[in-house]
Amino acid sequence: MKNLIIYFIIFSSILFSQDQLFVGTRPLGMGGAFTAVADDGNTITWNPAGLPRLRRKEFTSSYADLYAMDITHSYTGIVWPFGDRVAVGFDWSNVGFDDQELNYSDNKLNFSVGYQPFKLLSIGGTFKYISRDMGLDGTSYGKSTGIGYDLGFLISPHKKLRLGLSLYDLGGTDVTYK
């Protein structure tokens, strides 16, 4: 019973975390200050405006056991540049926990497009689909799905200066529980 209470405390923080960014070792190592850098495959999640600045296809993947409590995070992403001004990216992220009593799964699928109309400016947008499921003793206590949108900007006014802005969940991410 004590373990069950601990699991509920942990999962309540995860459930209401509102799409925390656990993506990429480098962005996390930078304390999340990756919005203006946005120069690898993790830019799909952090700032989609970085996509057209990538000059080759990129694939990224990670797996982590968070908090040493069998809460796992899996991530896979791929970016395809089309010329010098446009790139698209897809990624999938899963945070989950599964034991004999309690299970939780949070899946997110992103589709991102980035466009660089000028050398100084690039913009990007992400459409995301979210699916969540929580159960206890084999019984589902909440399934939800929803969609959301993100928008990103990168401005490079100088060779050694880049400014980034990411707007997450524009208009609110609508997640409906069934």
Region locations from a protein language model:
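Subset of outer-membrane beta-barrel
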Residues: 18-178
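Positively charged n-region of N-terminal signal peptides that target proteins for export
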Residues: 1-4, 119
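Sec-dependent N-terminal signal peptides
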Residues: 3-15
